[in-house]
């Protein structure tokens, strides 16, 4: 699902389910760590696409880390997005501190979008 479609879905569900249910979501940047969407061949293809040096003999985790670090350099925080970062945002949205928040997506992207506004 595209991020635009997700944003629209979250807003529409928030309207339909209010006031008893809050509907929110997260919009993460690329999460490489722990992702099944990044098998070795895809990681190597991405490293080649971006002309990043790598060792073919490196472990799968080592190659994924190289790719994650490259993606991190493209953000304002220079931090790789980790599944734990996404989980923390979800926990916030599900908890009492967000009791008046509904119909929104929280970007978990290290400022990726803003990095390209410059």
Whereabouts are the PLM-identified features?
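Short, small/polar-rich loop/turn modules that mediate ligand/substrate recognition or access, typified
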Residues: 18-22, 101-103
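A conserved structural motif in NAD(P)-dependent oxidoreductases
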Residues: 59-64, 75-86
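Active-site helix of classical SDR
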Residues: 2, 10
């Amino acid at each position: 699902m595209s991020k635009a479609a997700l944003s629209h879905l979250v807003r529409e569900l928030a309207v339909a389910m209010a006031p008893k249910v809050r509907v929110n979501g997260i919009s993460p940047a690329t999460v490489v760590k722990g992702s099944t969407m990044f098998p070795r061949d895809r990681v190597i293809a991405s490293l080649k696409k971006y002309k990043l040096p790598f060792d073919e003999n490196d472990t799968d985790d080592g190659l994924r880390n190289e790719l994650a670090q490259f993606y991190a350099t493209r953000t304002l925080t220079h931090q790789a997005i980790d599944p734990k970062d996404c989980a923390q945002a979800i926990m916030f949205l599900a908890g009492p501190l967000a009791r008046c928040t509904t119909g929104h997506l929280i970007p978990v992207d290290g400022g990726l979008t803003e990095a390209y506004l410059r």
